[in-house]
């Protein structure tokens, strides 16, 4: 397979995992996948939080490792990109992951990692080895968020016509995880070849979710760079403009 085909396969393979075995991936594996190369990702020391758990209220079973996503509000898009790049690298190694935005103890995590002034822990990523069969809680969670039901690519294109050569990248965006499966990203295609990216005002995780989706797009189409989106559309939040090199 070509590198692009490999990346697409990893994106198609990735599923949110909530039922893990008791085998915990090492911090070295997490770091090799990008957990410490980003200023927004911090491996949670299991010893510092006691019993290796971050208070996930029964949503997560088993003993995965945890990576805290720590950033300021205006850094959430890049934090989402960096976090999902790590997720894809872990997926390629056969390690399951799950983004957690609300179902964990922020206090417990904040006490275990360094949080810069003005920043906060916006999410954690659980990473571990998936159990062969999903537990009851996981099955209920997947049903409640309609995890296997996603919008069509055409549903998040709000203007212009997407070039056919971007079909794979846009399908990768469609497969990106998001809080409650809301998929808050919207794309507008310009005649110049640039793409204006917006977010719907859904919840406090919107910018993080758009960053996660952008990680998928840029993984498949790395020859785009991000710049400021100066185009206003009512009821949408301008996130970035993607410009082809």
PLM region descriptions:
Residues 1-245:
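Acidic, surface-exposed loops and disordered segments
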């Amino acid at each position: 397979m070509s590198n692009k085909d490999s990346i697409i396969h990893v994106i198609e393979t990735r599923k949110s995992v909530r039922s893990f075995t008791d085998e915990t991936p090492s911090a070295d594996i997490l770091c090799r996948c990008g957990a410490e190369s980003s200023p927004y990702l911090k491996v949670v020391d299991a010893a510092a939080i006691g019993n290796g758990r971050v208070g996930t209220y029964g949503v997560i079973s088993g003993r995965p490792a945890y990576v805290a996503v720590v950033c300021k509000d205006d850094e959430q898009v890049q934090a989402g990109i960096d976090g999902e790049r790590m997720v894809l690298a872990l997926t390629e190694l056969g390690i399951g992951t799950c983004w957690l935005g609300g179902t964990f103890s922020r206090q417990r995590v904040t006490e275990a990692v360094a949080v810069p002034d003005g920043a906060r822990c916006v999410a954690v990523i659980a990473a571990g080895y998936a159990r062969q069969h999903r537990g009851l809680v996981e099955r209920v969670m997947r049903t409640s968020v309609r995890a296997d039901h996603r919008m069509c690519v055409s549903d998040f294109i709000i203007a212009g016509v997407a070039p056919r050569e971007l079909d794979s990248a846009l399908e990768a965006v469609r497969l990106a995880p998001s809080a409650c499966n809301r998929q808050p990203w919207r794309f507008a295609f310009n005649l110049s070849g640039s793409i204006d990216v917006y977010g719907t005002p859904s919840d406090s995780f919107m910018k993080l979710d758009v960053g996660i989706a952008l990680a998928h797009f840029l993984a498949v189409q790395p020859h785009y760079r991000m710049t400021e989106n100066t185009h206003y559309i009512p009821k949408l939040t301008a996130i970035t403009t993607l410009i082809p090199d």
